[in-house]
Amino acid sequence: MQCQKCENIAVYTRKYSGESLCSECFSNSILRKAAKTISKYKMIKNDELVVVGVSGGKDSLVLLSILKKMSETHNFKIIAVTIDEGIPGYRDEALGIVKSFCSKLDVEFRTYSYKELYDVTLSESLELREDEKTTSCSICGIFRRRALDHAAKELGANVIATGHNLDDSLQTFLINTLSGDSNKIGWMSPGSDSKQIRKIKPLAEIYESEIVFYAFTNDLPFQTEPCPHMNEGIRTEIREFLNSLENQHSGIKNNMYRSIIKISEVMKDVSFKEKRICSNCGNQCTGKICAVCNMI
């Protein structure tokens, strides 16, 4: 089969569009998609410093690679930041991969750990939880977001970029819907209009399967060992359900994503909560005490 953009042999076919592409044209299409998302939501401005959250997985390393290429032709800088949760036998491999890749790209690299920020590792925090229904992913997510905020403030960054893809958004929407947490539905936009540090998701309109193929076709290293806590919640089941739907009805993920963004915009004002200052640590929150302090 021939690439529809050039005369080379096609190696990838997008079922939802019927488009067959060679390796180079496929990679260029991913770069264009990310650039279009960044432009559409005005994610990065001139002279800004972007902290790129890099876990060592495929999404974050693809994001780092793309933003590095863009920073060479656009006026912004990037710093890679990895958060060490303190999961025995898991995080060490990722740290090695990220450090080596950042050295290859000539990107500044920093690490921050839960232990140094909160005086507990993720494993230790799980022993402190009052309710077993509170999953490790919930705790880790709260800690990770605060850690990235801390890193961005310390480094003087304007923006935090994470590697969340289209599939992640669909899964999160369904998790919040099924758990009755409608307040979080209003914050699904991949961009941010915050006057403080902005949170952006440049890969938010790209399928997870395409990010995997981009990583392989560009020989990007990434950690394949899954987090030992990944199956505690229902995300894995939802991922499999959505993949099954996509296999039977090509393009259904794209349709659902567009609907979610529209719903999120409608829900944004309804979900709005005035920001307060945590009486314990001084960070912004929506209650008297922030989620991090409530946990530790």
What function would you assign to each model-found segment?
Residues Q2-I175, S179-G186, A204-N218, C290:
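ATP-dependent adenylation/nucleotidyltransferase module used to activate substrates
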